[in-house]
Amino acid sequence: MDEHDIFKLITAGVRFTKKSKKEPSSKQQLQPLPEVSKHEEPVKSEESDKDDEDITEFRLLDGDSSNQPKRKKPKKEKTLSPKELEIQKAAEEANETRKQYGIRVLGKNVPPPVDSFGTLTRDFKMLPRLQQNLLSRNFDHPTPIQMQALPVLLQRRALMACAPTGSGKTLAFLTPIINGLRAHKTTGLRALVLAPTRELAQQIYRECAELTRETGLRTHFISKVSEAKQKHGAECKQRYDILVSTPNRVRFLLQQEPPLLDLSHVEWFVLDEADRLMEEGQNNFKEQLDDIYAACSNPTKCVAFFSATYTVPVAKWALRHLKNLVRITIGVQNSATETVQQELLFVGSEGGKLVAIRDLVRQGLQPPVLVFVQSKERAKQLFEELLYDGINVDVIHAERSQHQRDNCVKAFREGSIWVLICTELMGRGIDFKGVNLVINYDFPPTTISYIHRIGRTGRAGRPGRAITFFTQEDTSNLRGIALIIKNSGGTVPEYMLQMKKVRKSEAKMRAKKPLDREDISTKIRPETKGDEKHKSTKLKKVERTEKILKNRKGYEKDLNSKQKKLGNIKTELKPAGKRKGNVEKKTKNKNNQT
């Protein structure tokens, strides 16, 4: 059998087509036989040769059959029914609307956003009286958060919403509550709205009272716990439909024997500023919220969380407790509003802050102005300094009585106070109309705190301005806030963006325990024992660095550059008495020489 016979045998029944461009598989390729030496040439019978040829012929033919081109059957285009075409068109329109207004949603079967309050009347049978109340408050067109949150809550879906400050979140949860409750019932509380501060809860209550006019619904705000027994006790015949309060007061009433509140009929459970209520650390509301949520035993209740920032504790709690959850985000998550002009101002030291704020006053401030500090002690100190400068200023903090705080907020709203100094107490949700400037006198401990602070200005589309002072000690937290300013359309120096990122553990520590800052004062105060201790510890550190430098190679070169600095620091840190003694010795030596 020669080469031609072998080729014919191999190619028997094979058809070569131009269409098939596939390379032959490893099984179909002819593999060279292993070389056999003449001395070890195997002896085979003719029968075995024929059997092998038949086997190879079968294998090749079998493999070649798979190499033939398979014609794919053309897919039949699915014809959509008129209903399916309408659904597809509606979904495309909803996505276009979301893209236009920067709305992002997560969840199954999320309803499309609404473009007007009239759509709610048509699709969800909104109360005519409620729509009239909205128009009387000049709410003629829904904001992006309202466009998406209203249809979700009107379907009684669990919701976690994040939208910038001043975007209309309060109206987004009050409207579905009022429309869902419809009219007054004597069963008791059917809606519970919780806020982290009394001022914010009072603001929500005022808004709710305006929207429930002539609807028959009764809204209540717990101003004093002592009066709650008369209004919520078993002897009281008056029943409220909506309760707005802080977690502390609600939990206190639940812990009384017997409990003064019955939350078993609650149909709506809403948390405003949920990230503050759920945050970890000192003065948190987690335990209180767990007790209150357990008391709301109605299995059909609708739960909604609203905030300007997303945090991990809120997301964990929502995923653990809520079913069929919808998540809505407006714009960039955890970002500031674009209507606020943001500035970072380096002031050098704590003393430079007073100089900077007085320069701003000299240039001409446009009231009203909010000034944020990190503690109530510093708020008092700054108040005294600015009061002596003749500025129309007031201060609000936790040590002031509730009556004083209410009067202070009222005066600031009316415009009789131009500058209001406050702590983090006023950084959440409070809506002051027309605040032109926010000054972060003390650098915010976290980026979330910064977003909420500057959110007191530039609300409802109005322009605003925010100035943040920072010293050398604040540079470690500078990068995060610089990124927020850049993401919201502002300009920051490039070196701020290239700074080292802070570790999570360090960021948590600084959030829990802010920096220990110098007192706000222009007075020259005498040195105290605490100052002497501080100086002695600093002196020890300087001496320790000198020892380390001496042990290094090339110490002389290094010391020449640093010796002057270390010497100046040591002379400043040494007690005044020792310095005087040294000066007297030097003068005596000079006199003796003369």
Curated annotation (Swiss-Prot):
Its EC number is 3.6.4.13. It catalyses: ATP + H2O = ADP + phosphate + H(+). PROSITE patterns: DEAD_ATP_HELICASE, HELICASE_ATP_BIND_1, HELICASE_CTER, Q_MOTIF. Keywords: ATP-binding, Helicase, Hydrolase, Nucleotide-binding, Nucleus, Ribosome biogenesis, RNA-binding, rRNA processing. Pfam families: DEAD, Helicase_C. Gene3D superfamilies: P-loop containing nucleotide triphosphate hydrolases. A motif (DEAD box) lies at residues 272-275. Residues 339-503 form the Helicase C-terminal domain. Residues 150-328 form the Helicase ATP-binding domain. One of its GO terms (molecular function) is ATP binding. GO terms for cellular component: cytosol; nucleolus. A motif (Q motif) lies at residues 119-147. InterPro entries: DDX52/Rok1_DEADc, DEAD/DEAH_box_helicase_dom, DEAD_box_RNA_helicase, Helicase_ATP-bd, Helicase_C-like, P-loop_NTPase, RNA-helicase_DEAD-box_CS. It comes from the Eukaryota. Residues 13-86, 505-594 are annotated as: Disordered. ATP binds at A163, P164, T165, G166, S167, G168, K169, T170. It is found in: Nucleus, Nucleolus. SUPFAM superfamilies: P-loop containing nucleoside triphosphate hydrolases. Belongs to the DEAD box helicase family. DDX52/ROK1 subfamily. Part of a translational control module, also containing pths/DDX47 and ath/DHX33, which coordinates germline stem cell differentiation with ribosome biogenesis during oogenesis. This module allows for coregulation of ribosomal proteins and non1/GTPBP4, a p53 repressor, preventing p53 stabilization, cell cycle arrest and loss of stem cell differentiation. Controls cell cycle progression by regulating translation of mRNAs that contain a terminal oligo pyrimidine (TOP) motif in their 5' UTRs, such as non1. Involved in rRNA maturation or pre-rRNA processing during ribosome biogenesis. This is Probable ATP-dependent RNA helicase DDX52. It comes from Drosophila melanogaster. The lineage of its organism: Eukaryota, Metazoa, Ecdysozoa, Arthropoda, Hexapoda. The gene is ais.
